[in-house]
Amino acid sequence: MKKVVVITGATDGVGRALAKILSKEYDLALCGRSDEKMDALLDELGDCHVYHECFDITDDHRRHAFGEHVKAEFGTVDVVVNNAGANTKKDKVTDINLSDLRYMFELNCVSAIGIVQEFYPVMKEKQSGLFVNILSTCCLFHNPMTGGYSASKDAMEGISKILLKEVKADNIGVCN
């Protein structure tokens, strides 16, 4: 029985590349926003066991439904890659629209916490698992015009460090 890897933001960039690489050895549960991009990715993956849904990861109800569907499809989850995210608005900190800032936090941090909450109970029950939270070099460099994005990714970095301490006793790993 193959291990199961969940990848959010699977239709572009890092998520897409991971799906292509991991599909050779793992069963996959993928989510992204674009039906067209997901269909193209599924064509590239060929004959492997993939469950997929397209939705906005910031939608609490859809995210929860995805978690329930994945657990029903596979019965377990071994690795979760929190990859969904974007720099949706480049602006000076003094000029950033607070609605844009809130959305970046929802997309880059809060939704990842929601995904952790969906799959943690499965990992805890079997005393095994790994959460991989994809961050950004912005956590190192904090460049101008990336205040909202950098802050949201920095928040996720902090959450990851705390999460590691909280789930370590359950034999669950966390890395960035």
Where are these regions (language model features)?
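Conserved glycine-rich cofactor-binding loop
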Residues: 11-12
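Conserved glycine-rich Rossmann-like NAD(P)H-binding loop of the short-chain dehydrogenase/reductase
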Residues: 25-40
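The beta1-alpha1 cofactor-binding region of Rossmann-like NAD(H)/NADP(H)-dependent oxidoreductases
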Residues: 54-65, 98
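Substrate-binding pocket helix/loop in short-chain dehydrogenase/reductase
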Residues: 91-93, 100-102
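Active-site loop immediately N-terminal to the catalytic Tyr-X3-Lys motif
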Residues: 93-94, 141-147
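Active-site helix of classical SDR
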Residues: 116, 152
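Residue(s) in the substrate-gating loop at a strand-loop-helix junction
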Residues: 136
